[in-house]
Each structure stands twice: as C-alpha cells, then as structure tokens.
Amino acid sequence: MNLETMRIHSKAPLPGGIQDRNEKNRPSLKSLKADNRLEKSKYKPLWGKIFYLDLPSITICEKLQKDIKELGGRVEEFLSKDISYFVSNKKEAKYAQTLGRVSPVPSPESAYTAETTSPHPSHDGSSFKSQDRVCLSRGKLLAEKAVKDHDFIPANSILSNALSWGVKILHIDDIRYYIEQKKKALSALKKSSASGKDAGKKAGPGIQKTRTGRLKKPFLKVEDVNRCYRPFYLQLPSLPCINYFLQKPCSPFDIEKSSSVQKQAQPKLRINMDGDKCGTPVQLQLKEKRKKGYCECCLQKYEDLETHLLSEKHRNFAQSNQYQVVDDIVSQLVFDFVEYGRDTPQKKRIRYSVGSLSSVSANVLKNTAPKEKPLLEPNFQKDVGESSGHLLKPNSQYEETQKPEEKHGFASEPTTYSSAGLKGCDRKPVSMFNASEPDPEQEYAQLPLRDSTPEHQVTEGRNDGEQRVDPAPGVSQSCGQVSHLSTESNLPQPQLAADITQLSAKDLQEKGFHVVIGHASDLVALNTSKEQLTMKARTPPCSPQEPHECDTENMENLPCGKIQRKVRMLLGQQKANAEPSAELDKKRTEYLPAHEDRTCGSPVQSLLDLFQTSEEKSEFLGFTGYTENSGICDVLDIWEEENSSTLLSTFFSSPSTSAFVGF
C-alpha cells in the first residue's frame, strides 16, 4: 500500500453525517436522537457523537474533552461497541482506517467488497488496488492480512479491538483540525445572529422594565426633579423627633441609643451661641471621666466611686465589727518600719573650699605635770578608739598611754575626715586640704570660753606634757583635728623643717619674718596675712624650769583652738611591726640631731614633703614634731619673693566665690 494515499485519507475532513451499519443493534444511540436534530446540528455539530480518548497527556486530554463538549459531543471513559470515534495519538491511527475491518470469518467476497461498502470512500477511488486481487485464493488473502496486522497493528491491543468492533479511528491531529474549523464557523454564525437582534431592538420602542413597590410608613425619600437620577429612600421603624438642643457635630435625628456615645464625643471647642461676632471658640470645661468599677464588699457595680463610698450600704459594711479581731492584732504589733527614702528629707552636701589662710604663731612649752583636763571630748570615742586600738580619755591616764615617739601638729584650716577616709587610710593617705563629705558619726563638741576671752587650751599626752597656744588678735580662728603620725609610716621627717635655726635673725627681719623658737617645740604655726607674713621670734629658748614665764609672755599673741588627736592604729600590723618600729625610733632620734646644721631647702619641696608618704598602706595622722632634745626650729621655711605670691594665692581665695580643686 502506498503511504501517500494513507496520508491523504487521514487528512480528509470528517463527514457531516456519520452512519453506522449496526445502528439498529445499538439501543443507547436511539435515546440521543431528537426532532430538533437539524437545529442543534447547526450550533452543535458533534451532537449525539460519543468519543473515547486514548491520550497519555492529561493536559491535552482535558483540553480536547472541553472542546468536544462545547460542540455537543460526549466523552466515555471505557471502550465499548457504543463508541462512535476512537481518538489516539499513535502512528497506527493514521492508516488504520484504510485497512478496513477485519472480519472474524473472512471470505473472498469480503475482501473484494471491503472498499465499496465502506462508509468512508476514498477520494481517489480504489486506485491502489489491482485486479489481480480478485484472482487470489483464500489462503493467500488470509496470509496477506495476517502479515499486515502483524506489521502495523499489534494483536490484542485497544486499537485492534476498536477495529474489530467497527469503531471509527481518528488521529489527534485530525480531530484538532476539525474542531478549529467548526469553532470559526460557529463564531461567524453567532456574529451574524447578534447583528440581526441588535437591528430589531433599535427598530422597536425602548421599553425598560422597572421594579415597582410601595414603601412602608414612616420613610424618607429623596427624588430628583429632572428625573436624571433614581430616588433613594430610607424606611424607619418610627418617625424620628428633631432635637434642637444637641451640640453642633451631632445630628438632630440621633436616636436615644447613641446618647452614651454622644456624651463621650463632646467637642472641646464650640462657637458661643450668645453672639460673639468674631466667632472666637470657647473651650468647654469637660467633666472628669468617671471610672466605673465593682465593689467586692457590697458585691455590686458602681458608676462613681465617691458616691458609692458614701452610700448607706457601703457605710454599714465599713462600720461593722466584722474585722475587729484583725484590728486588735494589728494594734499589738510593734511599729518598726523603715522610712521610705522619698519621705525622708534629703541632706545637702557641704562643699569645702580653702579660704584665707589663718595666720598664727605658736610657742610650745613643756610641763612636767598636767594641770588641766582636756576640754574637747569627741563623741565618737567608741567607734574610732576601738578601731585604732586607743581610747581617747580626758584624763591623765590617756596622756600616759601615749608613746614619746608620736608626733602632733596644728592646722589653721578646719578639716574633717570622712568615714571612708578613716577606713581606707591603709590604701591612700588623707589630705587635710581636700576634705571630703563630713561623716555623720564624727561630731565635735563646742569649745567653751575661759574667763570671757577667746582662749583655748590644747592638752596633749606626750611625755606627760601640756602645750598651750592663745589666739592672736585680728586673725580668723579655726582649729582642725589631726590624726597622729605613727612611726610605721616612713615620712621624711628631716625635710619637714630643714634646719631653720641656721638662719640668723637679721636675715629674717630683712624679709619681714619673726621666728618664735621654743626649747621643746613640738607645734608649728605660721602667722600670715594678705599683706605680709609676720612671725615674732625669741632667740633665747625658755628653760624647762621657767615654763610659766614663757607661757604668760606668749599667751596674748598665740591663737589656737582646742585640738584632740584622732588615733588610729593598724591592729593587724601592730604586733608584727612592734620590733621594727622600736628600731626606727632609735634611728630617728639619732638622725634628727645629726642634721640640725643643714641649710634650708626649697620651700615648695618642704611643703610637698609635708603630704608625701613612702608606703602604700601608710596614713596621714598629723603634722610632725621632734623630740625634747632636738632644739630644731619648727617653723616653715622662708618663702621666696618670686614664689610667695603664687603659692599663697591658693590659700587666700574666698570660700564663697571659689572652690578648691587641688594642687
């Protein structure tokens, strides 16, 4: 068989009327026929046709099934004899129809009449057949058909079964081409019919259907006079009442349900209705929003708390004796609550500044026996005394407990030591000129006056001696308490007052200095003023046998306050350093007389050495003094003219205008 002829037959369009031989034997197809078959075939060309799709692709199968249903066809899921067309995408489907039907009992006549009785006559006739086939025997024809079926259509396949049942076989390309042609024809037909309907509508009168009805009273209806817009309406359950007393943003037709919302949405500003021509807005005094709540005592809700508390029901509950037992127990408890920090008054921090330096002159006298008891008794003897290992006692026993190696001194500026400074003195030295915040535990007693004169006595327990200094006229008086300097701290003692005795009185008078030198001087005082520095000196020292004469001569010129030493010892190191301290005392007494004849050093260096220490755990406990037999002048070194103005300016500043920030 020629393959070109097979392609021509496969591309031929489907015939309009498909007739089956066994139509009478198919009762299911009779139900599909109807009287209006011609009308439906016009818009549904596949009406009454049943298709079976043998396609592996689901997407293509669904699309083709949709197109078939639009054209009036029906798709079955199972292959049977009732199927009209078998659609497949296999190659055998293109030429399977040209082979004719394979009869179960083939005969010589069937092969001859196969093409003539076929419902699909070929366009080119039976040109591919020859007259020799008529002369073929029955065996040859059977063998030829068996070879053809074996080569092109496999046995026992769906395609062979469809051929044996007489089902028309179509390729997918053929059915697609047929559907496209029918869609184009239907679209053209619909356009022509739609144009005819439009022409008929334009020719006829324009009648518009309207939905009419009756509104139930009461209602509101708004209509357009020109009738260009449709009316809108609103049916109400009851006729609203107009309220003229509502404020401006609210509608006069508001229902009572919105009254609560209306109160919450009151405006803050409104125009005065009484006739302010400028229309200035007046701010309304809105009432405070009442907070609703629930009373657990009365077991009821309330709108306002104050009104509920004043109600009779709540007052009866509050005045009842149900909780009298609890009140009695609470009244027996001890009130030991700590005051809250917010309630306690805040204490202002006192700031200290170095003001004008009080100029004093000192003369130290030695007495063999104490005559008076000390007048200053600190209130913190217990705290400081226990921590330092010494109790400050205002009697002779306290004076006897003092070591002869301990040194004492005066300070003209009021100085206090904080608790942090006392506790942490083993880590950092205490400075007299940079006082910290006063400790509330350190309270000093008031210095009483003696014989109506501003005279004060200083009693120090050093070698059972007593030292007295009196205030000088015209000089501000102040006393500072100084801690004693232990021998454990290796301070440069010889450099504190470096041999001032070598200076002659003549040199001192040229520079305006007067030196007061005592035989057993342990206290150093400097008398300064803003104009000049004056120191009154007596070169012949007082003998130990005449202490009262020296005392009476200098009592009028020596200012002083009552000074009580603060003693603090390191208890942990007291025993460990007992022997080294004794050796240091011996070396100290030997070292001081050896350097009596040295010349004075720089005044700045001597002042810096005053606050310098050589150990990390040492503490500043007072100005130093010397032994009885030293005979050294304990007056500070002479100020040089070029350095005196700059150095003294730090001490002559007013405490109200400036603050001391440090050296």
UniProtKB/Swiss-Prot annotation:
Residues 113-129 have a biased composition (Polar residues). Induction: In a cell cycle-dependent manner. Induced at low level through G1. Increased during S phase and decreased at the end of S phase. SMART domains: ZnF_DBF. Phosphorylation increases its interaction with PSIP1. GO terms for cellular component: nuclear body; nucleus. Coiled coil: none annotated. The keyword Metal-binding applies. A motif (Integrase domain-binding motif 2 (IBM2)) lies at residues 644-663. Residues 20-29, 400-410, 452-469 have a biased composition (Basic and acidic residues). A zinc finger (DBF4-type) spans 288-336. It is found in: Nucleus. Keywords: Cell cycle, DNA replication, Metal-binding, Nucleus, Phosphoprotein, Repeat, Zinc, Zinc-finger. Residues 1-29, 99-131, 369-480 are annotated as: Disordered. Its main location: nucleus. Residues 40-128, 154-179 form the BRCT domain. Zn(2+) binds at residues 295, 298, 308, 314. GO terms for biological process: DNA replication; traversing start control point of mitotic cell cycle. A motif (Integrase domain-binding motif 1 (IBM1)) lies at residues 603-627. The modification Phosphothreonine is found at residue 344. The modification Phosphoserine is found at residues 311, 353, 358, 412, 614, 656, 658. Forms a complex with CDC7. Note that CDC7 forms distinct complex either with DBF4A or DBF4B. Such complexes are stable upon replication stress. Interacts with MEN1, MCM2, ORC2, ORC4 and ORC6. Interacts (via IBM motifs) with PSIP1 (via IBD domain); phosphorylation increases its affinity for PSIP1. This is Protein DBF4 homolog A. It comes from Mus musculus (Mouse).
